[in-house]
């Protein structure tokens, strides 16, 4: 009797396992979605002014990398850290993300930080659309003017010199405090 009960349980568990595997839809697998977001976000990105954003997206939602500004007096690369939605919606929405750069490296300290917040939109013309806040350390009396606001669009295609000049002439602002401090 005991062998019959054990055999019946084993058959039941096998049936449940096979049924679950057969009914799983791989296109709805959240791990597949995470991999797609990771693969899409990871890489080298350029904004409209030619600044370079090199990022790695971790499976846990972490963003790590460097940012090199093409404007102002920023020298070399600055470390960035951030987060992204590692389980993005599957309805075609963008993937929410954000990162911060403290404008201090071995060459310069601007006593400021910029945060970018936006969405990664995949596809053949992948882009990251962001809004940024640049806050500089200042006295209490000048706190009212310590934060600048702007926007950047990042693509994986480096902009041409003509495109960068057009953006500058159009008055496109940037999140580089070393440029803002000189204004």
Swiss-Prot record:
GO MF assignments: biotin binding
Localization per Swiss-Prot or TrEMBL: Secreted
Keywords of the record: Biotin, Secreted, Signal
Alphabetized SUPFAM superfamilies for the sequence: Avidin/streptavidin
Residues annotated as domain Avidin-like: 37-159
Primary localization: secreted
Origin: domain of life: Bacteria
Chain sites annotated for binding biotin: 67, 78, 116, 132, 144
Cellular component GO terms, alphabetical: extracellular region
InterPro entries linked to this entry: Avidin, Avidin-like_CS, Avidin-like_sf, Avidin/str, Avidin/Streptavidin-rel
Chain's role: The biological function of streptavidin is not known. Forms a strong non-covalent specific complex with biotin (one molecule of biotin per subunit of streptavidin).
Family: Belongs to the avidin/streptavidin family.
The name this protein goes by in its record: Streptavidin-V1
Organism (species): Streptomyces violaceus
């Amino acid at each position: 009797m005991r062998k019959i009960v054990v055999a019946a349980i084993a058959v039941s568990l096998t049936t449940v396992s096979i049924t679950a595997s057969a009914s799983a839809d791989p296109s709805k697998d959240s791990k597949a979605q995470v991999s797609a977001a990771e693969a899409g976000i990871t890489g080298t990105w350029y904004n409209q002014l030619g600044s370079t954003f090199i990022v790695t997206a971790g499976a846990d939602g972490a963003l790590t990398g460097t940012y090199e500004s093409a404007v102002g007096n920023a020298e070399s690369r600055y470390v960035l850290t951030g987060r992204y939605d590692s389980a993005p919606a599957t309805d075609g929405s963008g993937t929410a993300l954000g990162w911060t750069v403290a404008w201090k490296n071995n060459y310069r300290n601007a006593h400021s930080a910029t945060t970018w917040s936006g969405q990664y939109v995949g596809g053949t013309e992948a882009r990251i659309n962001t809004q940024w806040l640049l806050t500089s350390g200042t006295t209490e009396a000048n706190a009212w003017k310590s934060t600048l606001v702007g926007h950047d669009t990042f693509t994986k295609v480096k902009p041409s010199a003509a495109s960068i000049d057009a953006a500058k002439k159009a008055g496109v602002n940037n999140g580089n405090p070393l440029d803002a401090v000189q204004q």
